[in-house]
Amino acid sequence: MLNRPSHIRPVCYRLNDKTLEASLQSSMGLHELEEVDPSLADGHRIFYEREVPFELRSAQGNEEPREVGALEAIRVKILALGDEGAFTGLRVELTSESNLFFHYVHELDIAGFKKLQQGQNLMVDFAEYPSVMVRNLDNCIKQPHSHLAVLVMKRDGSARLDFIQNMEYKFIELLSIDLKASAEEVVRDQIAYRYNAMKNRMALMQARLADVNALVKIKNPSLLLQLKKASLS
């Protein structure tokens, strides 16, 4: 954010049609960018997307890791297939900004959910399962000392995500889901998308900044000079 000198009063201008059109075109560009997301290619739509603190652990063979893992912010994307309230499929994608090749997926349909439901005695149906996931993830964000998300990764590419509640006197496992590392071509497509998305967003922001500079230069050239000096100080 620019530090505006105290003697400069804020100046407001009414946007003309061309400026408004440029703003709309920028918004359309971002919308079109979302449409090429490979995660949405098979009809899924984004249900939830946030960064969540995860404890990452690496397992050797079938032995459970005993040491506490590293804490890292993992971006969680939940994608649903079908109409709201009548989902036919669900996919959870885990990615990391610090490691572009980190990409784990949990996929579940109605039949797979029934096995999960029976194995963990879940008292919800498949339509409510996404909300259960969201509640656990949000609890890990809002109450990190009492709600934990532990991701245990194995060498064969399989992984398990455990949602755990710390009750002071004991740990309670709320939910456990299986994931697996994505195939190389999937990871490659995801990296290409994220790179191009960032590149296009930067281009859109640079174009918008150029439009603002041009408008201020016409309306108030001295203000533009003062803003540039303030940004350099």
Regions found by a protein language model. Give the residues of each.
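Detector for methionine-enriched segments
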Residues: 1, 28, 123, 133, ...
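Short amphipathic alpha-helical molecular recognition features
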Residues: 44-46, 84, 105, 114-125, ...
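N-terminal, leucine/charged-rich tether regions that mediate assembly and partner docking
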Residues: 2-143
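Short amphipathic alpha-helical segments embedded in low-complexity Lys/Glu-rich regions
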Residues: 95, 107-111, 150-151, 212, ...
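Intrinsically disordered, low-complexity acidic regions
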Residues: 170-233
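Functionally constrained cores in energy, signaling, and assembly domains
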Residues: 103, 165, 219
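Extended assembly-interface/linker segments at domain junctions
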Residues: 128-189
